Amino acid sequence: AESMLKYGTDKPDLRNPLIIHDLTEYFSTVEFKPFKGRPVRGIVVPNCAGQSKGWYEKMLAFAMDIGMKGLGYITVQEDGSYKGPIDKFLSPEKKEELRTMLDLKTDDTLFFICDNIRIVNDLAGQIRTELGRRLDLIDKDRFDLCFITDFPMFERDDDGKLIFTHNPFSMPQGEMDALLHQEPTEIKAYQYDIVCNGVELSSGAVRNHR
């Protein structure tokens, strides 16, 4: 869950310094209809406010190509004010709350990603990767490895049916007690992946042997 929220993927490239933030609760008190009642993610990009209009248009085009309906953003000006399509929907109090919460600084750009819960993290992850590529933020001479653990055992498909997320033969954490008493989508499996620079090198699991 942490990897999906922070990086938008379970195969994160940790050379990319950009982090995804969950802004759903923040926007629950903002009167902006496209975000109302839906999960919202944000990505802060330092020293990006000076990019050209054409650069932002290319990012919007990329967002549309991957299935998004748009790509909102605000930039932080020298006087501390915000500029961008969403700025007018934020009260002075909400602007200050956002600044404090994300430690926004002059020349930062904050991108907003909003969609349904099943795909919003994936979309945010693709935007994060594209920003890293376009801004040349990824150190190609580095190897960053990580273990991804605590995979959810089940998820629901578009029809609400329970399906396995990965290996159905893995042991659930909590074993039979978890299967009998926990909400299925909250059960975690004894599974892991080894990831390097966004590539899965290997995976493993404790088999359901008892």
Q: What is each model feature region?
A:
Residues 1-210:
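Class II aminoacyl-tRNA synthetase catalytic cores and aaRS-like
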